[in-house]
Amino acid sequence: MTNNPKWWDNTVTIYNKYSDPITNVVRWYRTVVSGCFWKRTTEKISLNNSVLESDNVICRIPENENFRQKYDWLQIPNDQMQNYFTLGIGDIIVNGEVTDEINEYTAGARSSDVLKKYADLGTMTIESVRINTKTGVLFNRHYLAKGV
């Protein structure tokens, strides 16, 4: 049982990108996680009498026994990677449970297609990750992904 706040009520689909170092074939592994927090924000910056806007997404994922840090996940044999997930720069998160498989070699199934297809649900390409599993009373143990 988790002690996450009641507003951590989102289910997300995480797509982990893996490039085989021998064959250079790109594969994506999909994982669905529930009990997450999802928030889209717009950041405004004033610069030289102009206002620049940037959309950002924050996703908090509760601590999970199947999570591996990126380096450790990359050491897992290919036939077992689907049993675990990671969060790394360039990985994709969709706000909601989706079943699409990403295949960069098939038109309509590429990562760009999935991002476009689910834009209304909410998607992010991860730009930074923080592992908050040693936090104190103020926050629950979780992984924080930020992106656009």
Identify the role of each PLM range.
Residues 27-148:
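Short, conserved turn/kink motifs that form compact alpha/beta structural patches or helix kinks used as
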Residues 1-34, 41-44:
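N-terminal intrinsically disordered, low-complexity, charge/repeat-rich segments that act as generic
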